[in-house]
A protein has these predicted regions:
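Intrinsic, short, N-terminal disordered tails of RNA polymerase sigma-factor systems
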Residues: 1-250
Length: 250
């Protein structure tokens, strides 16, 4: 599995943001409005890969794993499980895993009722299912929880990079972003030669290095901001960043 450049999950200065706890708690209320439900669907689409990976590693088939994850999300939101979460100690990563493990304990009793969440389709698996399956096969040497954590960390990194990409495309800088990605996100084992990349972009090497410095800083800020949405206490951001960095470096 591709590993990011060491340090990119350890630094950054973005301020703490509204957490995803807020989104899911609002969606879990009995009187939740349509906007809250849409936010809930977005939340489910974001975090299904690590949950799906964990269920698959428990020995379930792809079809059953999809049914279970779909049913799990419906169960969380329909039974107000999220409103009972202890946010004072809350990390979304560990809360969702613990809730899923509890859900699986009674899974057999629910199997007939949770087929793809009944009539509710919170998650669309088709688009990213092949890559999730491939990543799971590449981490067959890991235990279930480690595989979950690695998929979680990879999801955070992927979302951060997507946000960076969208921002720079809007600024008309998509070309040099594609050239510089190997230096920033560690998508190749050996980064390309800086002089060759500078020549392709038609800039001096010194300019390329300035761009790299700025790009890394923006990437770190986005990573930090993304992690901040998954913890209830801003003081936990640095520790969670360090933990995810260790997971990715295994």
């Amino acid at each position: 599995m591709t590993k990011p450049v060491p340090g990119t999950l350890q630094e950054g200065g973005a301020p703490f943001q509204t957490t995803h706890w807020t989104v899911v708690l609002q969606a879990g209320q009995v009187d939740a409005d349509e906007s809250a439900r849409k936010a809930l669907a977005t939340f489910s689409e974001t975090y299904w890969p690590p949950l799906y990976t964990f269920v698959r590693r428990r020995g379930y088939s792809p079809a059953d794993a999809q049914d279970i994850v779909q049913g799990f999300f419906v169960h969380l939101f329909e039974h107000n499980t999220l409103t009972r979460a202890d946010q004072e100690k809350g990390r979304l990563r560990t809360f969702l895993l613990g809730s899923l493990q509890n859900f699986l304990l009674k899974q057999r009793e629910r199997m007939s009722a949770i087929k793809r969440g009944g009539n509710q389709q919170l998650v669309s698996f088709d688009l990213h299912l092949p890559e999730t399956e491939a990543a799971m096969q590449a981490t067959a040497h890991l235990d279930q929880v480690s595989c979950y954590d690695l998929t979680w960390a990879s999801t955070i990194v992927k979302r951060s990079w997507q946000q960076l990409h969208q921002t720079l495309v809007a600024e008309g800088k998509a070309q040099w972003l594609d050239e510089l990605k190997p230096f920033v996100a560690g998508v190749v084992a050996v980064p390309p030669n800086q002089e060759e990349v500078a020549a392709r972009l038609g800039v001096p090497v010194a300019t390329l290095r300035t761009w790299l410095s700025r790009l890394r800083q923006r990437y770190r800020e986005l990573l930090r901001a993304e992690v901040a949405t998954t913890v209830s206490d801003p003081a936990d951001v640095n520790e969670e960043l360090r933990y995810l960095h260790r997971v990715l470096m295994v």
